[in-house]
């Protein structure tokens, strides 16, 4: 935690260790997320013309606008705000927000950001003594509506406590106002929210129980590479001494919180005064994901502008970004034969377990590992997943690809793979769709206003199967993901025999609308 003047920063989802900098971090390179490959030739992706957002208690400084110091921050901001207004100079400045911004858009040679040319809009909520979830929702909505309403991802490196929630016996059930706000905004503004996971002694878990974005835990280095879920993450089953805390501060029911992990231990970043500090926390894992969206979206927009085949405006959908990044995550290091999809690292939980030892690998009703979700962010692999383009259910599909489609209640969409799959190779499939949250818009201005609320219309139940090409009986699947509580399904399994296969998206149970939009990403190895 940090204080700056009168600043009362109880909302930050972070454990920060301020140490002298000894070794510069390489979290965006091959020790971390492999984004440096995309920044270099021939890709040359820097996030140009892509807008991303940041919502925090405070905000970073804007050089030439805020006269806090002679030092020029290593980033440029597209806009700075206090809630839904332009921020006044020298107000709501915060070291934590500055360091999070550095991860995303720093143009410094020593401490480069993931997407230095992205347009970052930063919004401050202000002192929590004078605000709470309504003000946080207002600030989020304001950031989502910047850049003419075209903001591709928003970073949340802060959170709210259950103790401050106005509900009686509040729990992480997706019903907090801020959580509903995030899921509503993700749908109506079509923006991917990336939420820093709960950690340390807890106390700041809202909105980690959202459905429509990505929640992250953070990793530490082992043998020079970010591979291990750090102990400070609250992302384990509720057992042992901390059982009562952990049980209260993870999702209610069977739905798991963590979707993806990213580097967050001992990251070197600049504060407001230009001092280099070593920091740790989920707060610094989340912006690795948020800024990676900017790199992918720059590439996607290039393909759209060039009118390349297998590209459409669907590439901008938040569900597509979620499915692509989760599906391309590292789990188990490939030995070089490609059977493990070219993965670059073996990721370990706190207790030294791999994804192949998880209940998510063994049980089709559990799509996510409790601690690592689908695995570790690999931005270059996400590019490989994304760059193969969109393939619809009306055509034979490539070995790697994605789609944005719809399915009707009690029906299914089949995606037939064009080429036979290789025996003993692994397949990765991710299906993502939204919970339906609606604004109770009392003044009918199509905006959230303080004192307004939301209506949760629930989550339709979709499943995903990998079936032999000629098989129509779902019970005879090769692999499946069949959760009844999640807004995503994920398959990672070996192919038993060579042959032709298809992916089936099944609309199992209708809760709200008859037609459900979804994003699907797949990665296979063909003969």
Summary of predicted features, one role per range:
Residues 26-28, 37-135, 148-153, 163-165, ...:
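Subtilisin-like serine protease catalytic core
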Residues 15-20:
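N-terminal signal peptide c-region/cleavage motif recognized by signal peptidases
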Residues 342-460, 520-527:
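Secreted peptidase-domain scaffold signal
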